[in-house]
Structure formats: C-alpha cells, structure tokens
C-alpha cells in the first residue's frame, strides 16, 4: 500500500530534522528546500539518500535537482510508489524492521 501524503510529509519531516535540525512543524508541502528551509545541496543529498531508503524509491540526481519543494518530493514519491508498488513495499518493510 502506498504511503499517504501526510505519512510522506511526516517521514520527510523526521529525515529533515535529523539531517538539518529543522523542526518538523516547519516542513509543509509549500515550503521550498532552499528558499524557505535554507537547506544546502549537501544536506539535500543526505535527505534524498534517507528518503530513498525509507520509501523504497530511487531519486536520480537529475530528478533531485528539480524537486524544489516538500510537495514536489511528496508527489515524486507517490508517483514512484504507484509505478512499482511491490518494490516500494518491500523496501519500506525492510526499513521498518531495521528501526
């Protein structure tokens, strides 16, 4: 089962807090990673890696550059999960077991 928008935002908020120290309440769909949350490119790569692990998706570098807001990432994850739900579910289960 694919994650809901709210679940993805909550998961991203946890990752962003861990990587940058930004409060989860600041992470909302309309927020820009650079302009609003002041996240640099190195932190963005770390967020992407952890997001890939958590949601069982692969975010190529060329796609990462186009993901400017939290909402962009949510939509991207949902699209990838819809395209390959079995792989996403298996990786999410593995990630949950590792917690």
From Swiss-Prot:
- Where the protein is mainly located, per its record? cytoplasm
The record's account of how the chain is modified after translation: 4'-phosphopantetheine is transferred from CoA to a specific serine of apo-AcpM.
Q: Which GO terms describe its biological process?
A: lipid A biosynthetic process
| Superkingdom, taxonomy of origin | Bacteria
Domain (Carrier) spans 3-81
- UniProt keyword annotations, A-Z: Cytoplasm, Fatty acid biosynthesis, Fatty acid metabolism, Isopeptide bond, Lipid biosynthesis, Lipid metabolism, Phosphopantetheine, Phosphoprotein, Ubl conjugation
Subcellular location(s) of the protein: Cytoplasm
Q: Where is this cross-link: Isoglutamyl lysine isopeptide (Lys-Gln) (interchain with Q-Cter in protein Pup)?
A: 79
GO CC terms of this entry: cytosol; membrane
Cited function = Acyl carrier protein involved in meromycolate extension.
Q: Which family does it belong to?
A: Belongs to the acyl carrier protein (ACP) family.
Report the protein name in the record: Meromycolate extension acyl carrier protein
User: Mind giving the lineage of the organism this protein is from?
Assistant: Bacteria, Bacillati, Actinomycetota, Actinomycetes, Mycobacteriales
Q: Which gene encodes it?
A: acpM
